[in-house]
């Protein structure tokens, strides 16, 4: 069945950890483009619950402790399958990913099984070390997958929900987004890219460089 022949049911998975300032903004900006929001709380210790409203369109999943982004993505994807969505969107809770581009990602699912936001043509504001690590990881992953991967680390993605059971990540950290692509290529699923702007703020990144690199290399070479 071609999911684009009817109006698809869209679920947006938003993993978050201590994002009480930005989470409600992201949810409100995403609601016009998704039927369901699956907000995955990764052990937050702030007062985020005071800032969001849970209703029939906003589902909250919570972990008791901080498990990692990959763990949260896994839980969110499973919930999306459970709720019988046709399309699963993933995006970050820190306002880096503009939800108004969700329709463009969905449109490209006519041609691909996975569509990833490509930020690397829009580098304004991206810290230099992030540009370097992203380009290097994208080159290495392109070699591994025998396909040009423009932006391997972007978490702003659209998936056909029907393929999620084949590509769920086991990695708990940031490397999970790379693992998903490795799993997808092993199953011969197609991967496309849509150019998006990315908004970078001055706040300190939570990505621990050494741990992330080690996880990325483990995914790449196993």
What are these regions (language model features)?
Residues 41-50, 95:
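A conserved acidic beta->alpha catalytic loop
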Residues 19-22, 44, 98:
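Donor nucleotide-sugar binding loop of glycosyltransferases
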Residues 9-11, 179:
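Cell-envelope/extracellular polymer assembly enzymes that use nucleotide-activated donors
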Residues 16-32:
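Short, well-formed alpha-helical segments that are part of the catalytic scaffolds
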Residues 85-96:
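Short beta-strand-to-loop acidic/aromatic patch adjacent to the donor-nucleotide binding site
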Residues 65-67, 71-82, 99-174, 200-219:
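Acceptor/aglycone-binding surface of glycosyltransferases and processive sugar-polymer synthases
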């Amino acid at each position: 069945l071609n999911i684009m022949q009817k109006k698809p049911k869209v679920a947006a998975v938003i993993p978050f950890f201590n994002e009480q300032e930005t989470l409600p903004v992201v949810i409100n900006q995403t609601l016009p483009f998704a039927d369901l929001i699956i907000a995955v709380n990764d052990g937050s210790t702030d007062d985020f619950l005071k800032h969001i409203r849970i209703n029939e369109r906003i589902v909250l999943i919570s972990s008791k402790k901080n498990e990692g982004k990959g763990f949260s993505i896994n839980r969110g994807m499973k919930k999306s399958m459970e709720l019988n969505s046709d399309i699963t969107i993933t995006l970050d809770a820190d306002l880096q990913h503009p939800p108004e581009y969700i329709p463009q990602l969905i449109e490209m699912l006519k041609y691909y099984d996975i569509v990833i936001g490509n930020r690397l043509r829009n580098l304004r504001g991206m810290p230099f070390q992030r540009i370097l690590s992203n380009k290097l990881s994208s080159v290495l992953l392109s070699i591994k997958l025998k396909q040009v991967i423009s932006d391997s680390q972007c978490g702003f993605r659209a998936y056909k929900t029907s393929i999620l059971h084949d590509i769920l990540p086991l990695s708990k950290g940031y490397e999970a987004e790379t693992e998903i692509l490795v799993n997808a290529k092993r199953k011969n699923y197609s991967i496309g890219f849509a150019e998006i702007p990315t908004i970078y703020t001055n706040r300190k990144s939570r990505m621990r460089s050494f741990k992330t690199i080690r996880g990325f290399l483990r995914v790449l070479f196993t």
